């Protein structure tokens, strides 16, 4: 299907699959000296050309909003293609390097931390534009996972995730596409994409997910970054965050923190898991962390109660002396 779409738009060069996310299939096309990234967004809800056009307009509006706040992101050429009973969006952009997840995962400590610093330089552009001077909520949203940042040959970092287009449309933030069906799902998505506290928490857990062995250094870097903003909301949140207490807590306090975990404590759960793996790398490897992240995955609503129950069992077992 991808090759058929590429032929339809006249891009039938050498095709290489790139890591794809939830919303799009992504390929790199090379032909006659140029390289283009092609993202194909195929959604069942795009049944009419009007719905596809509205989504394309939102992506363009988000791109412009990012440029307005100084975020470096590649230009996009958007095409709408008929595909059976629905319409697909095809987004063509210049190749700006591979995403930095593998660089963080396999690089030296210096390479890893330098890469994170470059990510934070982009995140800073978002944080410098809150909805008001004393708010932790931002004008533009983002998904700060390392998969959404690329490093080009000149060493320039780019933010490349324009789908969903996380900007404020008619006074309401677009957090996902399609939007979560429950208020709890919307609120969680808003917190992780439009609130500086949630964005830093997502970045913290995602980075430590990849490099739990460098967790102390990563936390130090993020703490220094957050202190650069005169925002009491941000400071107070992490001062009171139970994940910080867990680091230095004794066995009984750690047990109490785990027992109190609820279905909205997704990022606290993930944070605790990466701390446990950092302390006990021989017993709790990346596979164990991935199990926890999988059990805490959510979209329309908070994770199921049985998932939280299983997580608490796993974390409680991890606290037992070895």
Predicted feature locations:
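Juxta-kinase regulatory segment immediately upstream of eukaryotic protein kinase catalytic domains
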Residues: 1-13
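Short, flexible/disordered intra-domain loops and linkers
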Residues: 41-54, 103-110, 172-175
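Conserved structural core of kinase catalytic domains
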Residues: 64, 70-121
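Conserved kinase catalytic-core segment
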Residues: 114-142, 146-149
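ATP-binding glycine-rich loop module of kinase domains
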Residues: 12-63
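Helical subdomain adjoining the active site within ATP-dependent kinase catalytic cores
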Residues: 198-322
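Catalytic activation segment of kinase domains across protein kinase-like and atypical kinase folds
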Residues: 135-209
């Amino acid at each position: 299907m991808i090759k058929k779409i590429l032929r339809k738009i006249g891009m039938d060069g050498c095709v290489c699959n790139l890591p794809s996310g939830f919303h799009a299939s992504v390929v790199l096309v090379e032909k006659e000296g140029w390289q283009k990234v092609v993202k194909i967004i195929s959604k069942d809800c795009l049944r009419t050309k009007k719905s596809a056009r509205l989504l394309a307009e939102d992506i363009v509006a988000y791109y412009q909003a990012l440029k307005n706040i100084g975020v470096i992101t590649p230009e996009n050429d958007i095409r709408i293609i008929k595909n059976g009973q629905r319409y697909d969006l095809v987004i063509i952009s210049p190749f700006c390097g591979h995403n930095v997840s593998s660089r963080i995962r396999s690089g030296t400590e210096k390479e890893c931390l330098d890469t994170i610093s470059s990510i934070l330089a982009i995140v800073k552009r978002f944080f410098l534009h809150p909805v008001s001077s004393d708010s932790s909520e931002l004008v533009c949203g983002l998904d700060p996972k390392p998969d959404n940042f690329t490093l080009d040959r000149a060493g320039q970092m780019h933010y490349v995730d324009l789908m969903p287009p996380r900007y404020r449309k008619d006074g309401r933030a677009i957090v996902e596409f399609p939007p979560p069906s429950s208020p709890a799902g919307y609120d969680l998505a808003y917190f992780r994409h439009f609130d500086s506290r949630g964005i830093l928490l997502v970045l913290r857990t995602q980075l430590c997910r990849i490099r739990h062995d460098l967790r102390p250094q990563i936390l130090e870097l993020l703490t220094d970054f957050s202190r650069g903003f005169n925002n009491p909301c941000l400071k107070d949140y992490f001062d009171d965050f139970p994940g910080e207490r867990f680091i230095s807590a004794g066995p009984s306090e750690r047990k109490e923190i785990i027992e109190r975990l609820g279905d909205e404590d997704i990022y606290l759960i993930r944070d605790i898991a990466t701390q446990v793996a950092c302390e006990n790398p021989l017993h709790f490897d990346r596979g164990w962390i991935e199990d926890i992240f999988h059990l805490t995955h959510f979209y329309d609503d908070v994770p199921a109660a049985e998932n939280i129950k299983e997580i608490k069992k796993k974390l409680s077992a991890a606290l037992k002396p070895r």
